[in-house]
């Protein structure tokens, strides 16, 4: 048996990546079911609930990256960041954006490079799929790592607490208020202080490091755990109410910077860090977790294309009830993408640039 933290690798992070990747798949699968269900119907509400409990994926991914890249134990140089991490992400984006563009061209219109021209092709690749925003965001955070490490490694705990407070006020609080009350009023209030955009995902990135290094007190931990079910219920009820009021699906409260999604994400991160970092696992289980964790980027990149294929061929909404349908389709999508990612990742020379 081996410790959950072995050979410099924390199995808690591997498990979190797997769960976060699956939550992203559930999020997008349930979103398709929601779009095809009348607002206020039982199917709409069940699908919306599934959507509400699967919003923690991206914050978890970002906190894991922050905990790893900002750690004192990891050796990081500007050259290594750009030549290995950022360059790899850029190549991954280029490969998959072109693949999505060709896929969409073949299925939705006849692909003809000479007719489209290089400018239209490049533009089409850049905007081939909305979910590629994550790659640009993570590359931006990677670029800031050297500055963040210098600050964080010399900062006192009270300074880090101050940063978290600012993040919660100017990002979490602001976003939540903008969803619940008049946006223009919130803008006017927060615009008085010109640090409204202080954090964005940088807040989650730094928070991952802080939680990993310092943790939280027992009281804060139990408060977080206790608020998770309350937050999930409130998230769902607010979205359901706003959807009924607008007559259309209204998922605004589910934003990554909404207070309830924030609580859910932080509580999960803390729980896995505290529990699974110390758990004893067999070498076989550890190997399985590590390999599947390494496939999560490929799963994230591919699942939209597979989901689109399922939807266009009528596999999404049929006679199967929504909740079992969402779970079944999510599992199928996750497994297929995981298998393909595992194969691509093992290709000599080019595998690391594919997923």
Residue ranges and their predicted role:
Residues 61, 70, 100-108, 112-183, ...:
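Hydrophobic alpha-helical segments with transmembrane-like composition
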Residues 2-5, 273-293, 304-355:
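C-terminal "closing" transmembrane helix and its immediate cytosolic amphipathic cap
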Residues 22, 26-29, 97-98, 165-178, ...:
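Aromatic-anchored segments of alpha-helical transmembrane domains
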Residues 11-71, 89-97, 127:
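Functionally critical transmembrane alpha-helices in membrane proteins and complexes, commonly lining
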């Amino acid at each position: 048996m081996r410790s959950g933290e072995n050979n410099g690798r924390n199995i808690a992070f591997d498990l979190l990546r797997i769960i976060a990747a699956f939550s992203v798949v559930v999020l997008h699968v349930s979103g398709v079911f929601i779009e095809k269900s009348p607002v206020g119907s039982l199917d709409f509400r069940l699908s919306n609930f599934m959507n509400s409990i699967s919003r923690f994926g991206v914050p978890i991914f970002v906190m894991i990256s922050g905990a790893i890249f900002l750690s004192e134990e990891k050796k990081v140089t500007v050259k290594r960041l750009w030549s290995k991490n950022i360059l790899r992400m850029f190549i991954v984006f280029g490969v998959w954006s072109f693949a999505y563009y060709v896929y969409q061209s073949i299925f939705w219109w006849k692909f003809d490079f000479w007719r489209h021209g290089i400018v239209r092709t490049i533009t089409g690749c850049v905007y081939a799929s909305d979910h590629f925003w994550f790659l640009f965001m993570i590359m931006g955070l990677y670029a800031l790592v050297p500055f963040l490490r210098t600050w964080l490694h010399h900062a006192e705990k009270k300074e880090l607490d101050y940063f978290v407070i600012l993040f919660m006020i100017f990002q979490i609080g602001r976003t939540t208020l903008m969803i619940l009350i008049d946006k223009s009023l919130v803008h006017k209030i927060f615009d008085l202080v010109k640090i409204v955009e202080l954090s964005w995902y940088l807040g989650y990135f730094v928070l991952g490091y802080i939680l990993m290094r310092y943790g939280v007190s027992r009281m804060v931990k139990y408060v977080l755990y206790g608020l998770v079910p309350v937050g999930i219920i409130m998230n769902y009820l607010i979205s359901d109410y706003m959807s009924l009021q607008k007559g259309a699906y209204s998922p605004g409260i589910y934003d990554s910077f909404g207070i309830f999604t924030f609580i859910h994400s932080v509580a999960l991160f803390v729980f896995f860090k505290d529990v699974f970092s110390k758990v004893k696992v067999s070498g076989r289980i550890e190997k399985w977790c590590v390999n599947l964790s390494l496939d999560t980027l490929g799963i994230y990149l591919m699942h939209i294309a597979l989901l689109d294929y399922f939807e266009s061929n009528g596999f999404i909404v049929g006679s199967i009830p929504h909740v079992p349908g969402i779970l079944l389709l999510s599992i199928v999508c996750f497994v297929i993408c995981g298998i393909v990612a595992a194969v691509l990742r093992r290709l000599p020379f080019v595998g690391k640039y594919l997923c």
